[in-house]
Amino acid sequence: GNAEEAFLTGKRIGEAMREMGLNYDLAPVVDVESVCGNPAIGSRSFGTDAATVTRFGAEMARGIQAAGVMACAKHFPGHGGTNVDTHKSLPTITLSMEELEAGPLVPFYAAIEAGVKSIMTTHIMFPALDKEYPGTLSGAVLSALLRGKMRYGGIIITDCLEMGAIASRYGAAEAALLAAKAGADMPLISHSYNEAARAAELISRAIERGEMNMPEHNAALGRIAGAKEWLSMQ
């Protein structure tokens, strides 16, 4: 295939979603499948080399958004380098910063350049970036790298916090607070309403106690409002 086909496929998907009343597609997957047999990514990846994934991922994001649907590049900073399934366990990827820059991060740079409206985080340890917290809960990954070095101004959404990699260690609601403090705009709890409500309560209490960085919190609210405004104009 070619990049134009990726754009057209994304556009068709976006158009079909709009016909069904949907406006947010948690795609494309821009993980480079550098480890074969990856159970969480597998055939969802565009390929095993960064150049291919970069080309197709950016164009698919453009296509989805050309149809008036928000796209989401995932899973930052890269889920392709492990065969551990984050739905069950917490993996570690031991790439250096230089190796990350040369491989897994390349498609994300391209997606940002393409104007992707959101980026989803991954529940993986990257010791080169943060020895204590996985990507989803790491200020070094979300604020310093994605917001700072990569200059990303769109929405950061987490992967589902009820997945085994996170819930079994932190609890989903507690992780939502940690993710928000680390720089996530939209902590995602996709199964349990009660757990989502508890997460909202924990974040509200943290605000009341002065534990949140309020300029950053307000900036997150502004990014979400901006996305809603963009969608309303489509």
Model-flagged regions — what are they?
Residues 48-216:
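Second-shell residues forming the walls of enzyme active-site clefts
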Residues 47, 175-176, 229-234:
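Short, charged low-complexity intrinsically disordered segments located at boundaries
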Residues 37, 83, 229-233:
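Secretory-pathway/luminal and periplasmic proteins that interact with or process carbohydrate-rich
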Residues 1-22, 29-50, 57, 61:
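A substrate-binding/cap region within the structured catalytic cores of diverse enzymes
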Residues 205-234:
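Mid-to-C-terminal alpha-helical segments outside catalytic/metal-binding sites
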Residues 9-10, 179, 224:
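Short alpha-helical scaffolding segments that buttress acidic/His motifs in well-ordered protein cores
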